[in-house]
Amino acid sequence: MSERAPVVTIDGPSGAGKGTISQLLAKHLGWQLLDSGAIYRVLALAAIHHDVELENEESITLLAAHLDVKFLTGNEKDPVQVILEGEDVTTAIRTQECSNAASKVAAFPRVREALLRRQRAFRAAPGLIADGRDMGTVVFPTASAKLYLTASAEERAQRRYNQLQDKGFDVNIERLLAEIIERDDRDMNRPVAPLVPAEDALVIDTSDKGIDEVLELALNYINQKLSIAN
């Protein structure tokens, strides 16, 4: 791990565009990419596979400490390939069931502590784009630049609906909206590492913005922060 490698954090709720913008930024800058949400999704999937109760913090923490997961370079559709215990779970961790389960296990303080070092180990030259919910507040509090992407719950539900439809999943948009509102409440009100913008983060509402516009705003901000740091 390189303590001196610059880090840009991108936090925000589900469906705000973090994943897309993070991937584009990492590709544009030629930096490493950390999808922290994928780590929690993998942990949730491992718990489901091993019949571990999602409410059992002790068992989930033990599972987190011994999680056999690898992140490999993927393809254009899935830039990061996720391997759990030798099995490709890149698509499996993107289901709504897995997303909801990830939010539950992520609420446990001991689980977050167990995964903290694993996340920080992604920091390496030439730099890191860290995508998550507490990247700028907890994992990388001294990051070079911090972004917080948000959007209305309705817009995020529509995006998630389109994404899952494209992947062949049968989904109901009203149920998706209800689940997003429920997850927002859980993420924003958990006692440890709640979902909030870092005090020094640039907040971007992506509700009525296209990908190119958000990317340009992010790049301009990052370039400004990095030039000041240097």
Curated annotation (Swiss-Prot):
TM region(s), chain numbering: none
CDD domains, alphabetized: CMPK
Protein name as it appears in the record: Cytidylate kinase
EC numbers for this chain: 2.7.4.25
Domain of life: Bacteria
This protein's encoding gene: cmk
Keywords: ATP-binding, Cytoplasm, Kinase, Nucleotide-binding, Transferase
GO biological process terms, semicolon-separated: nucleobase-containing small molecule interconversion; pyrimidine nucleotide metabolic process
